[in-house]
């Protein structure tokens, strides 16, 4: 046998295997067979998470896996105290239910009394901002310069962005019955990522209004950790792809030669560049601007009375040069009580390897020649504290190659034919989101193909369960189409199941969740005539036009979305527009008749959600206009401090009861 024959056999075998795999994928798609744990895309950020763990000594780093085309993994259950408490609560509830079930027949010693520690005693309520957007893009791939800033409201940053797209691929026979085309997903995700990189989050910091700080004005560190981490992430890790470059020295000749160190809005000391009268060379001098009691010395991270030295040859040519630097949120953590005393900070800094992350937030306003001068002066070690020496040893030039991480990460991204649901969250919030699960339901061709249907995501944010459903329902203006849309909704509720490997009582169905948001192209139309609809639109009489809306009629009669809520429609119908135009399609007989309608909707179910506003965006990219809803949603946050206090009180009560029993 010639050497060519085995290669030909292997190539033929590989081709046959690919054909079998393609046929398997198509059959699974036709029959709407999905795995028990469906695949989805998510950002991989293990390296940065490890950096956060080393920098912040945080043991509860995120465990994200997967990527585009990879399988997202369900989060671990016992990653932090919150999950441990959730698991313990579930076990306690199960035990209580079992005790109640056998209470009639069980002996007295087997009966368990109810817990005296109420849930409200160790849970705090917190609001997060959720931006929900839906858009039918009509099968058009986005251009690289597509502007979606208004749609996602980057001027009002949210904690979570839930974005649902419909018809990301043309709904032709090849895309409906053939293998799934995921190329548009990467394009849309890139557009979304670039837009979110331009978001400037509003920072909420911890301020000290007294000097020295008053213990009563500070929250425990575990409660302020998220605020600090958010500030650090914004100052050090936002604006992905932005590199730090030296600034021209000549532009700063007119500025003062000083370096101000800030702490809670107050200047602690200043660094001046002076000229040595003996040598005529520039030197650096650090002076105290005001006196501080010795008992507060531990609050000064970078402290020195004075030091002098000779700069290098480069600095002699440019004269007096300095680096203006200001401490960012990362460095201020070490300045604020109740952090460890600073007499312990020096050895820790010297023992560690030079950290890029610690230095990169020092804002350089001069060239690296001035940095060389500072390093040369510090190298003489004339009574300079070890903290300053450690900073001098760090190579600021590495900042040139350091790129900042984005403030938002992709939590989950799932496609079914033309339906795409993608969720993005703040980096600081990611570790508080667990139990991410995905479910897909097709109700299209033959009642199972995914050209119509829903992509749903279940997750827990802190101690609260959320569910987001992106849907594309049956189209058409006939009465039978309206009935089919109602049937689609019932099928989605019936067949949406979130599987889990754990048995801790995680929600399986849509209505098992506490906060539910349903978005998408629901395709409910207006029952009014084309002429009457256009007349009411021209008069902007939205309340009268809303009386003909099929969806409003359906949930008022309880046939679909009974008990759900929606914001007031104070904007024109979102469908159907001419291409790249502000005009609705004309009823001229050349094209199928399309009466304008509010097809694109966002609904909510459950308590603890407050709608801020509900609007559409004037984006002419497709024949639909995108819709945005902003919610403030309550989440329950576990408080270890409150739980400890509650358990302490309970123990005291038990001891008192035992003492009374002994006395009796």
From Swiss-Prot:
Gene name, please?
A: IP5P3
Catalytic 2 as annotated region, ranges: 592-607
Residues of the region (Catalytic 1) are 514-529
Catalyses which reaction?
a 1,2-diacyl-sn-glycero-3-phospho-(1D-myo-inositol-4,5-bisphosphate) + H2O = a 1,2-diacyl-sn-glycero-3-phospho-(1D-myo-inositol 4-phosphate) + phosphate; a 1,2-diacyl-sn-glycero-3-phospho-(1D-myo-inositol-3,4,5-trisphosphate) + H2O = a 1,2-diacyl-sn-glycero-3-phospho-(1D-myo-inositol-3,4-bisphosphate) + phosphate
Extract the ranges annotated as region (Disordered). Answer: 35-76
Q: What is this protein called?
A: Type IV inositol polyphosphate 5-phosphatase 3
Compositional bias (Acidic residues) at which positions?
40-66
Describe its function.
Has phosphatase activity toward PtdIns(4,5)P2 and PtdIns(3,4,5)P3.
Decide whether keyword Transcription is in the record.
no
Q: Which family does it belong to?
A: Belongs to the inositol polyphosphate 5-phosphatase family.
Task: Provide this UniProt record's keywords sorted from A to Z.
Answer: Hydrolase
Q: Which GO terms describe its biological process?
A: phosphatidylinositol dephosphorylation
Please state what class of enzyme this protein is. hydrolase
Which organism is the protein's source?
Answer: Arabidopsis thaliana
Q: Which GO terms describe its molecular function?
A: inositol-polyphosphate 5-phosphatase activity; phosphatidylinositol-3,4,5-trisphosphate 5-phosphatase activity; phosphatidylinositol-4,5-bisphosphate 5-phosphatase activity
The EC number(s) given in the record are 3.1.3.36, 3.1.3.86
Q: Which domain of life is it from?
A: Eukaryota
């Amino acid at each position: 046998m010639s050497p060519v024959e085995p290669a030909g056999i292997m190539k033929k075998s590989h081709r046959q295997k690919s054909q079998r795999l393609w046929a398997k994928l198509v059959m699974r798609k036709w029959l709407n067979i999905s795995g028990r744990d469906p695949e989805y895309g998510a950002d991989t950020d293990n390296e940065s998470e490890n950096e956060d763990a080393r920098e912040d000594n945080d043991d509860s780093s995120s465990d994200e896996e997967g990527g585009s085309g990879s399988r997202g993994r369900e989060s671990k259950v016992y990653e932090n105290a919150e999950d441990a408490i959730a698991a313990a609560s579930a076990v306690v509830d199960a035990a209580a239910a079992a005790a109640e079930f056998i209470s009639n027949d069980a002996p007295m010693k087997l009966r368990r009394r109810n817990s005296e520690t109420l849930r409200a005693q160790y849970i705090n309520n917190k609001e997060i901002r959720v931006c929900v957007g839906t858009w039918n893009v009509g099968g058009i791939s986005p251009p690289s310069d597509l502007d979606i800033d208004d749609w996602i409201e980057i001027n009002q940053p949210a904690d979570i962005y839930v974005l649902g797209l419909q018809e990301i691929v043309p709904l032709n026979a090849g895309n409906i019955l053939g293998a799934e085309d995921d190329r548009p997903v990467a394009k849309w995700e890139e557009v979304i990522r670039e837009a979110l990189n331009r978001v400037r989050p509003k920072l909420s910091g911890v301020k000290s209004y007294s000097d020295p700080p008053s213990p009563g004005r500070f929250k425990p560190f575990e409660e302020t950790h998220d605020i600090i981490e958010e500030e650090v992430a914004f100052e050090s890790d936002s604006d992905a792809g932005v590199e730090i470059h030296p600034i021209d020295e000549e532009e700063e000749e007119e500025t003062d030669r000083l370096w101000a160190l800030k702490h809670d809005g107050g200047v602690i000391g200043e660094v001046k560049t002076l000229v040595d009268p003996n040598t005529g060379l520039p030197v650096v001098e650090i002076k105290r601007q005001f006196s501080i009691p010795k008992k507060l010395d531990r609050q000064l991270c970078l402290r020195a009375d004075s030091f002098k030295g000779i700069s290098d040859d480069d600095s002699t040519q440019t004269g007096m040069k300095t680096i203006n630097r200001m401490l960012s949120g990362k460095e201020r953590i070490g300045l604020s009580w109740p952090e460890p005393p600073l007499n312990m900070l020096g050895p820790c800094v010297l023992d560690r390897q030079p950290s890029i992350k610690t230095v990169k937030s020092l804002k350089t306003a001069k060239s690296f020649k001035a940095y060389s001068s500072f390093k040369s002066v510090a190298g003489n070690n004339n009574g300079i504290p070890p903290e300053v020496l450690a900073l001098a040893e760090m190579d600021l030039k590495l900042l040139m190659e350091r790129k900042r991480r984005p403030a938002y990460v992709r939590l989950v991204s799932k496609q079914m034919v033309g339906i795409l649901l993608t969720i993005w969250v703040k980096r600081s919030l990611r570790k508080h989101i667990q139990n991410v699960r995905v479910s897909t339901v097709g109700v299209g061709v033959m009642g199972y193909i995914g050209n119509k249907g829903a992509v749903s995501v279940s997750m827990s944010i802190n101690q609260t369960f959320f569910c987001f459903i992106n849907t594309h329902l049956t189209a058409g203006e006939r009465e039978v189409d309206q009935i089919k849309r109602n049937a689609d909704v019932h099928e989605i509720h019936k067949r949406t199941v979130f599987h889990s490997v754990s048995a801790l009582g995680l929600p399986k169905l849509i209505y098992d969740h506490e906060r539910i948001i349903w978005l998408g192209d629901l395709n409910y139309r207006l029952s009014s005539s084309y002429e009457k609809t256009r007349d009411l639109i021209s008069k902007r009489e939205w309340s009268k036009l809303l009386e003909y809306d099929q969806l409003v009629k359906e949930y008022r009669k309880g046939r679909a979305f009974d008990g759900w809520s929606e914001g007031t429609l104070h904007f024109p119908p979102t469908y159907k527009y001419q291409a790249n135009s502000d005009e609705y399609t004309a009823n001229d007989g050349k094209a199928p008749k399309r009466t304008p309608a509010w097809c694109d909707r966002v609904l909510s179910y459950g308590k603890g959600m407050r709608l801020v506003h509900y609007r559409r965006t004037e984006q002419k990219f497709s024949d639909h206009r995108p819709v945005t809803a902003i919610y403030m949603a309550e989440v329950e946050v576990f408080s270890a401090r409150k739980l400890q206090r509650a358990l302490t009180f309970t123990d005291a009560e038990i001891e008192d009861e035992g003492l009374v029993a002994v006395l009796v």
